[in-house]
Amino acid sequence: MHPQELSNPAGAIRWWVYQRERFPILANGTLIMAFSSSAVCFSSLLREEQGLPHWSAFAAAFITSFIFFLQLRIADEFKDSEEDEKFQPYRAVPRGLVTLRELGFVFLIGAFIQLGIALWLYPPLVGILLIAWAYLGLMSREFFVREWIKSRPVTYLWTHMGIMPLVDLYATATEWMPRGATVPDGLIWFLVVSFFNGVVIEVGRKIRSTDEEKPGVSTYTKLWGQRGAPLIWFGFLLVTAISASIAGSLIEFG
């Protein structure tokens, strides 16, 4: 059944429906756990540490990263609200399942949890957290050039993927900062991989067949064509693989 054909449930069940439609906890949580754990382990391996990193680094990296990705979803709900109302009224916010005010409250609760974790694990982590928040805030406001950036899809893509290395930097920092270390040599390649991973996912999810295209909904197949978009996506995938190979060589992986 299409979401627009569903009635909106009442009470707490609304949030279960919201996560199912807009931010599946199990699916996203599994990916984010792999994302954050690899960041912690990569940092430790770069510094040639023996044994597994402390559990607190894994926990802090996972919870904070999970909240970051939830905040990204909520930020999208805000900045896309007018377009969703017009072109995709069946989505959760336009159809009244949850309100933007409620989502904003969830966003703030998440931020307080992130802050609390940083202060608990190692207070200087707050510095990186603030940088990531600031970038997320700029993204939410379309860098204060909404019409300009929306008319330039490639610029829109790379500026919005800039958040990925920042989230990954924070995740790695939960391992190296509490130990009094500096940014590990070679970490830049891991951040490059995270950037292009984000690009691959973002471009891939907006490649549609002709009959799946919808009026008013931007896709990369509309921008680059039915043949061009998959080819460009494959190019990004290749760059990601090369970057990952370089990063892997730094820890003698593979």
Predicted regions and their residues:
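Cytosolic, membrane-interface loops and tails of multi-pass inner-membrane proteins
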Residues: H2-V17, E77-R95, E202-P230
